[in-house]
Amino acid sequence: MKFLDEAKVYVRSGDGGPGCVSFRREKFIEFGGPNGGDGGRGGDVWIECVQGLNTLIDYRYRQHFKAKKGEHGMGSNCHGAKGDDAVLQVPAGTQVFAEDGETLIADMTEVGQRVRLAKGGNGGFGNAYFTTSTNRAPRHANPGLEGQEMWLILRLKLIADAGLVGLPNAGKSTFLATVTAAKPKIADYPFTTLHPGLGVVRSDEREFVLADIPGLIEGAHEGVGLGDRFLAHVERCRVLLHLVEGTSEHAGKAYKLVRRELEAYGEGLSDKPEIVALSKADALDADTLKQQLARLKRAAGGKPLVLSAASGQGVQEALRAIQAQLDTQGAEEAEAQPAEPWQP
């Protein structure tokens, strides 16, 4: 399935149905009173977060969503039926913005969450509504109110427990394919990964979701190489596994470049817990490995992990380090939540 993380859609709620002008007709009653019913309310436009989706590709080929109009009122004080709603189904992590792209309308973070985007127009009153003591036989009814219409921008930010970051060709996709059932494209050239990918890691009878973020380059926070789009997916990750290619010219410089982009982008990316690892260790001789580790240790300010997704070296240690960080965060979040008041 193709990946799409931004789409522009047009939504319109249904118009209200018109009221009815009608009079009661019965045997032996020459002038029956008014009995025109009200029109039905127009359908609403909803957005719903559903399970099983991880892309907005459905909105590439269909951009217009219109709810049905309300039915007209009828005689015998019969009100019109409400128009059918229109529902946009999106994956968790989707944000809904107004047409200006800046005004946030809804943030869909949990499966089952529903938000009304446009309310249907009210139905018009039938002539029975206008009966008064001085006007016993009104001959007019209201038309229904028009629905709301607007253009909206949908943006998807993947929700994952941990995210893989690094320069292009750092071995992120190979790592994801090794530890999950995901099948990302893997090749020995930069920018093989063009879209973020997700996989479920099962380690030591525990599970967490891992996201493969496409490689970042210098200027990514300004949009170079679609970097700002990729960095947006890092916002929802709780822990970062920063892979630095061991075969790069200088591991320390490669690490600092990615850190600068995370800091420049903002949104708290540079403050997220980070696990640093030197990847592709199987391709290095002992002296080069020692030199690159020393460079990376100085740049990161701590001892990095050594791993090779191809040979399996250090993979389990990296997964346990991620799980430990997630457990620590979970404990801190539980302590931060206010305790429920005691009730007898």
Swiss-Prot record:
One GO CC annotation = cytoplasm
Which InterPro entries does this one have? G_OBG, GTP-bd, GTP-bd_Obg/CgtA, GTP1-OBG_CS, GTP1_OBG_dom, GTP1_OBG_dom_sf, OBG_GTPase, P-loop_NTPase
Instruction: Provide the gene name from the record.
Output: obg
**Binding-site residues, GTP:** 166-173, 191-195, 212-215, 279-282, 308-310
| Residues binding Mg(2+) | S173, T193
Q: Which UniProt keywords apply?
A: Cytoplasm, GTP-binding, Hydrolase, Magnesium, Metal-binding, Nucleotide-binding
- Record domain OBG-type G: where: 160-327
- Write down what this protein is called: GTPase Obg
The family database entries (CDD domains) matched by this protein are listed as: Obg
GO molecular function terms attached to this record: GTP binding; GTPase activity; magnesium ion binding
What's a Pfam family this protein contains? GTP1_OBG
Domain (Obg): give its ranges: 1-159
Output the Gene3D superfamilies linked to this UniProt entry.
GTP1/OBG domain (2.70.210.12), P-loop containing nucleotide triphosphate hydrolases (3.40.50.300)
Manganese as a keyword of this entry, yes or no, is no
Please give a single GO biological process term from the UniProt record: ribosome biogenesis
- Name the species this protein comes from: Methylorubrum extorquens (strain PA1) (Methylobacterium extorquens)
The Swiss-Prot or TrEMBL record lists the needed cofactor(s) as: Mg(2+)
According to its UniProt record, the EC number is 3.6.5.-
Biological function? An essential GTPase which binds GTP, GDP and possibly (p)ppGpp with moderate affinity, with high nucleotide exchange rates and a fairly low GTP hydrolysis rate. Plays a role in control of the cell cycle, stress response, ribosome biogenesis and in those bacteria that undergo differentiation, in morphogenesis control.
**Where is this protein localized, as stated in its record?**
Cytoplasm
Q: What HAMAP family does the record tag this protein with?
A: GTPase_Obg
